[in-house]
Amino acid sequence: ARLIVQHIEYSPIDQYYDVSVFTQAAVQGCLGVNTMKADKHLYDHVRFDSRNEKTFMEKLEENDEIEAYVKLPNSFYIPTPMGKYHPDWAIVFKQKLSKYPYFIAETKASDSSLQDRRIEEAKIECAKKHFAKTNGGKLKYNKVSSFEELLKIVTQESV
């Protein structure tokens, strides 16, 4: 997979995801267990998949520099040679914080097998190449382990 990723290229096309990709029938979960109320999210309630995601969402909600965010649906993906890659979050920052008003964040926890992690890392490398070619310089993509790491990335790159 590493050799394929080294040579993969993405090119901008004139197609976009329709806003219906964010149409959601209902959040299915248990409030306080795997779902939480949200004010800055696209929806009133958000389901999280891990403790790391829950902590990340809480920090997004608390921080004044966050304009809005969305946990990206499974219907939003980037095609890669290793299969579909589903980024976790789309985040909109207030303009004064970063030169990148938009940020796509990957917050995967490392509790999967070595083989799964290698495949996921290859998909993440493809996503980096995808977003570098298709965003017009206004969007930053990165894997982050915490909200604090996200802030460090956007504030260092705005200097």
Label every model-predicted segment.
Residues 1-85, 92-159:
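Intrinsically disordered, low-complexity, repeat-rich regions
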